[in-house]
């Protein structure tokens, strides 16, 4: 599985810890905030990573900022992306299993590195069942997305 890990100025330290933690099991790419350009605002970083997930460059991604909220909002602006703010393993699992989230976000000022590692592991261990009972909900999310994102 190809996984992108990125953090803004507040999240880059935790993003590095997560990337190092995952490298033995996944094909991990660390995206630095300076790679995103445009003064490295978290919105630009989120856009770059979410767009790369959408085009298939990465299968999943983890975005980190101070709270996880800003990168989550920004990633969800990319049509077709489902990003979820996760600060516990149950939410990370459900993000993948119930919502087919491609991206999780977290706050470096909210959780510590060891908890963040368990959250990343929980998210990446799950696979969405396209024929499962949550598929209808995800299809409905996609329909709402298409309704408002007519490009």
From Swiss-Prot:
What keywords tag this UniProt record? Carbohydrate metabolism, Isomerase
Query: Pfam families in the record, alphabetically?
Result: LacAB_rpiB
Q: Oxidoreductase: is it a keyword of this entry?
A: no
**InterPro entries cross-referenced by the UniProt entry:** RpiB_LacA_LacB, RpiB_LacA_LacB_sf, SPI_LacAB/RpiB
Q: Which GO terms describe its molecular function?
A: intramolecular oxidoreductase activity, interconverting aldoses and ketoses
- Its top-level enzyme class, in one word, is isomerase
Consequence of gene disruption:
Cells lacking this gene do not grow on erythritol as sole carbon source, in contrast to wild-type.
Any GO BP? carbohydrate metabolic process
As recorded in UniProt, its EC number(s) are 5.3.1.34
Q: Please state the pathway this protein functions in, per its UniProt record.
A: Carbohydrate metabolism; erythritol degradation
| Disulfide partners | none
Active site residues according to the UniProt entry: 65
Reactions catalysed according to its record: D-erythrulose 4-phosphate = D-erythrose 4-phosphate
The entry assigns this protein to a family as follows: Belongs to the LacAB/RpiB family.
NCBIfam families listed in its UniProt record:
PRK05571.1, rpiB_lacA_lacB
Functionally, this protein is described as follows:
Catalyzes the isomerization of D-erythrulose-4P to D-erythrose-4P. Involved in the degradation pathway of erythritol, that allows B.abortus to grow on this compound as the sole carbon source.
What name does UniProt use for this protein? D-erythrulose-4-phosphate isomerase
Q: Which organism is it from?
A: Brucella abortus (strain 2308)
Q: Which gene encodes it?
A: eryI
């Amino acid at each position: 599985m190809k996984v992108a890990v990125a953090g803004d100025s507040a999240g880059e330290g935790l993003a590095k810890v997560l990337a190092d933690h995952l490298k033995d099991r996944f094909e991990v790419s660390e995206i630095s905030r300076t790679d995103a350009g445009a003064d490295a605002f978290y919105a630009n970083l989120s856009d770059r990573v979410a767009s790369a997930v959408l085009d298939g460059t990465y299968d999943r991604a983890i975005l980190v900022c101070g709270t996880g909220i800003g990168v989550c909002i920004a990633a969800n602006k990319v049509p077709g992306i489902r990003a979820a703010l996760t600060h516990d393993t149950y939410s990370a699992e459900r993000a993948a299993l119930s919502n087919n989230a491609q991206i999780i976000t977290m706050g470096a000022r909210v959780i510590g590195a060891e908890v963040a590692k368990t959250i990343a592991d929980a998210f990446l261990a799950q696979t969405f069942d396209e024929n499962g009972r949550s598929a209808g909900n995800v299809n409905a999310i996609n329909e709402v997305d298409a309704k408002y994102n007519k490009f």
